[in-house]
Amino acid sequence: MHPLAALPDPLDLDSAAAAVRPLRGATFAVAGTPAAQATAAELVALLGGHVVAVADGARPLYHAAAALAANDLVALLQVAEQAAIAAGLTPAQARAGLGHLMQTALDAIRRLPDDAPLRLGLTGAVARGDAATVARHLQALNQHHPPTALLHCLLSAELVELMRDSALGPAALAALDTVLAQVPRPGE
């Protein structure tokens, strides 16, 4: 059983209830013999969770997707905090403010219907097609920490792809593509 849930170090938990809480409603990939899978499915049902089938050959990709969604989110907060602190926020202000921003962004995405495009949960310069603001952000990040500028560029390029079927229009998308193409990549 592999849950799509962030589980803290069990040594830090105060009770069994706290240990189970993140598992309630989670999606679980199950593997093993048919009997083991049936038992796992019963446990998942008791937790109000959902069972998904993941082929053995696809398991590394499944785990990578989980790492992108959870662990890389921590890395993203780390680099965002560093930029906010460099901009003048205290570490506590950066953590509280950016943590709140991330939570409200996740909440907005989770409120979307399952079949809705993720772009409907997007806010900010890319969603508006504001290439000039994206360019200013990239320039500031490049002065602060070039690897963070590259990270922002690569993630923004994914956001532009999300916006391709939106009402932005070809001129705004082309302007965003042009700005993002100007960020130096390793080896260039």
Predicted region positions:
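Rossmann-fold dinucleotide-binding core
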Residues: 1-63
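Helical "substrate-binding/catalytic lid" subdomain
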Residues: 57-148
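Short polybasic/polar patches that bind polyanions
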Residues: 45, 85, 164
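C-terminal active-site/capping subdomain that shapes the small-molecule cofactor and substrate pocket
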Residues: 116-188
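Short, well-structured alpha-helical segments
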Residues: 41, 95-99, 153, 177
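Generic hydrophobic, helix-prone segments enriched in Leu/Val/Ile
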Residues: 23, 62, 102, 152, ...
